[in-house]
């Protein structure tokens, strides 16, 4: 399980030196006063149940039918690899700071043509994120090369500033939701 201190740095709330005083990155949208309650949600990482989880996602997609999928972080890795196994069941994908990417050749289906990857702010604060945004762009480019409508939306380039890895918990999450809804509405 992650500690609050580890999450502070990894999720881009602030620097390690700023953790004990609660000093976030300037302009951070994360409600630092909620960190304790947020940390209560942390659970051990289950590394041996991935296949069972993928089977569950596929079963849900089969029951729902072709749909749009939104995923985040480690759930992005799980979901995107699952989509590559059953691209016929997904029409649109919105991946919020995913930790892994599908093989574009397996993920692109004539019916799954719309992909949006969203990345927040303060990426340069951690080499992990610098590498991840580069890999995200490579995934979008690979999907585009195969005929998909795939793009990376780096929020600061859209003047949406201060977002941590926990985009849906940040104070401006409604703004990100609106961007996502607009993107989906243009493609449905």
What are these language model-derived features?
Residues 69-70, 93:
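Conserved alpha/beta-hydrolase fold motif
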Residues 158-162, 166-188:
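Catalytic active-site module of serine/aspartate enzymes centered on a nucleophile-bearing elbow/loop
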């Amino acid at each position: 399980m992650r500690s609050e201190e580890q999450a502070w740095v990894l999720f881009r709330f602030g620097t390690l030196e700023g953790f004990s005083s609660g000093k976030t990155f300037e302009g951070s949208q994360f409600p630092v006063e909620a960190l304790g309650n947020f940390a209560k949600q942390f659970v051990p990482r289950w590394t041996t149940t991935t296949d069972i989880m993928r089977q569950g996602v596929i079963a849900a997609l089969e029951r729902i039918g072709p749909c749009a999928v939104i995923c985040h972080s480690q759930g992005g890795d799980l979901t995107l690899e699952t989509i590559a196994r059953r691209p016929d069941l997904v029409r649109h994908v919105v991946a919020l700071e995913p930790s892994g990417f599908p093989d574009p050749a397996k993920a692109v289906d004539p019916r799954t043509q719309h992909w949006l990857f969203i990345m927040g702010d303060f990426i340069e604060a951690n080499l992990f994120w610098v590498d991840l945004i580069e890999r995200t762009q490579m995934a979008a480019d690979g999907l585009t090369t195969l005929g998909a409508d795939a793009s990376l939306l780096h929020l600061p380039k859209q003047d949406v500033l201060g977002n941590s890895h926990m985009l849906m918990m940040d104070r401006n999450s409604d703004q990100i939701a609106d961007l996502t809804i607009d993107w989906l509405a243009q493609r449905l």
